[in-house]
Amino acid sequence: MYLKEIFVDNFRNLKKQKLEFCEGVNLIYGLNAQGKSNLLEAIRLLSMGRSFRGSKMSELVKFDEEYFYVRGLVRSADFYEKKIEFGYKVNGNKVIKVNGNKLKSTGEILGHFLTVIFSPEDIEIIKEGPSRRRKYLDACISVIDKNYFFDLLQYNKTLSNRNSLLKKIKEEGKGEDLLEIFDEKLAEYGARIIKVRNNYLEKLKNSMSKFLMEISNEKLEIIYLNSAGVKEVHEENLIREKLKNRLTKSLTLDLKYLSTQVGPHREDFKILINGYDSRVYSSQGQKRTAALCLKLSELEILEEETGEKPVLLLDDVMSELDDNRKKYILKKLEGFQSFITHTSKSDVEGDCCFKIYDGIVMRE
């Protein structure tokens, strides 16, 4: 899979322009604050339907403008081409199209254009709390499993309804008879979510272990702290039963905090390096290496599951790596289309080079 061209209009500081890209390494270089990351953000938007920086849609619109529009032409391994369009107005109207067909929701964009983003912020997945890891895990799985994405949406909707009911029970003293219905649904969706998460984390563990051993000769383990508290995570019926029981037992605590304290929305997974929790005990260098292995594993799993080579976006990553790791990652990226941002041309050899200045991208 590769991105043949992109057209941007009123996106961040980027000037209105159409760009054509190489199938190999596309080096985008220039001084800081000229728009390098903004270009990668526009590309990633066509893949995931949201900013990889966590920005609101309104923040992507150029200053003093009313809208932004991004269009990309993507070719898959079978040479089938897709035109993906994303338009947004500051009044909140959003239109996403694939080959001219309007999508009903942003989530429907997932899977049409596969990308993996590498950035210095990847270390946050290792360093920060459970919600950061859950968010990352859910995004990775949702791209390759539409059923998981649906279950996640339904679970979160049911969770919100249950939390509203808890407030009603606390304030009005009625509605407790409805909890059984919500608990059944949460257990049903939750069991499937837990099973799929476990399967993905098994693949992630195997892949990360391989990469970490190659890079630094260290051992890695992943421990999934599933909310059902079961060891046999492959038995969906058992997971559902255990999760339902835990929801029932946590009612007193739920009413105290007016929120559901048990379920996939509270889960976490630990990444252990040489037997120690990397979040707590690993050095900054070990955490950064673990984050690199995590993203390489995401890439490997995505390719295995889809049969497509994702497009790789490396946002100011090279400056964070020593020479050995830099050579290692460049070797792993061979055969993929990649977009690498850097402040100069000296460190990375690109098949195509683009200089960016004040939002204008010029091919050299």
UniProtKB/Swiss-Prot annotation:
Classification via Pfam families: SMC_N (PF02463)
Q: Does the keyword Cytoplasm apply?
A: yes
The subcellular localization recorded is: Cytoplasm
Arranged from A to Z, the UniProt key words for this protein are: ATP-binding, Cytoplasm, DNA damage, DNA repair, DNA replication, DNA-binding, Nucleotide-binding, SOS response
Query: What is its biological role?
Result: The RecF protein is involved in DNA metabolism; it is required for DNA replication and normal SOS inducibility. RecF binds preferentially to single-stranded, linear DNA. It also seems to bind ATP.
Q: Which HAMAP family match?
A: RecF
Family membership, please give it. Answer: Belongs to the RecF family.
The name this protein goes by in its record: DNA replication and repair protein RecF
Q: Which gene encodes it?
A: recF
